[in-house]
Amino acid sequence: MTSGILIASNVLLWGAFLALAALMLGVIRQIGLLHERSAPLGAMMIDHGPDVGERSPIFNVNTFDGEPVLVGRSITPGRPSLLMFTGPSCPICQKLLPIIRSVAAIEETDVILISDGTQAEHRQFLKDHPLDGELYVVSAEIGMRYQVSKVPYGVLLDQDGKILAKGLCNTREHVESLFETIREGHSTLQNYLKDENTAPKFKQVTANKVH
């Protein structure tokens, strides 16, 4: 009799524990969705690396295909460069790749994808997402010098290697904001939104976009 009661109580306790665990997972998921929906409309600076207005450090590296490239200066003379820090296992980076290509083509900007990880991961990434004019560089050093802690993260350089804008890029609006802030005469999204003349226009434009 006593053993039966103990077994029943244990079953009830485990049932309550599993129900509580399922409830907590649901709450965590909802918090994540809320955080995503409330994310800033533009690329936000979260690193402590080289500042906007400074010239980028120079890195003599090779692309994943073994071609030498000078990261930190223009790839094509007279054209700006977008350094996009990514990861082979980053789903947002994979989703953002065609958007980066589209925006870069409109802005006539060269793209350098900078990543880290194992050779096998990069081979699989490039197999699933073939390059289309971008350079692909595997270098932990560049990310460390820029102190990038989250990806995808973009750094826009002018033709002389000066940092024009930078920030976390999770959406098309984030990528576009790197260029938009410069056109409006601001170095960062934060300064752009502080401007009483440009902030309302920026918010109106992003509100009218269809996602």
From Swiss-Prot:
**Mind telling me which Gene3D superfamilies this protein's record contains?**
Glutaredoxin (3.40.30.10)
Alphabetized, the UniProt keywords read: Membrane, Transmembrane, Transmembrane helix
Q: Give GO BP annotations, semicolon-separated.
A: methylamine metabolic process
Where does it localize?
Membrane
- Transmembrane parts of this sequence: 5-25
Keyword Transmembrane helix present in the record's keywords: the answer is yes
> Where along the sequence do coiled-coil regions lie?
none
In the bilayer, the protein is annotated as:
Single-pass membrane protein
Keyword Membrane in record: yes
Sequence ranges assigned to domain Thioredoxin in this UniProt record: 50-187
Q: Tell me the pathway.
A: One-carbon metabolism; methylamine degradation
Species assigned in the record: Methylophilus methylotrophus
Briefly state the protein's biological role: May be specifically involved in the processing, transport, and/or maturation of the MADH beta-subunit.
Q: Record's Pfam families?
A: Thioredoxin_2
How is this protein annotated for GO cellular component?
membrane
Query: Could you identify this protein by its name?
Result: Methylamine utilization protein MauD
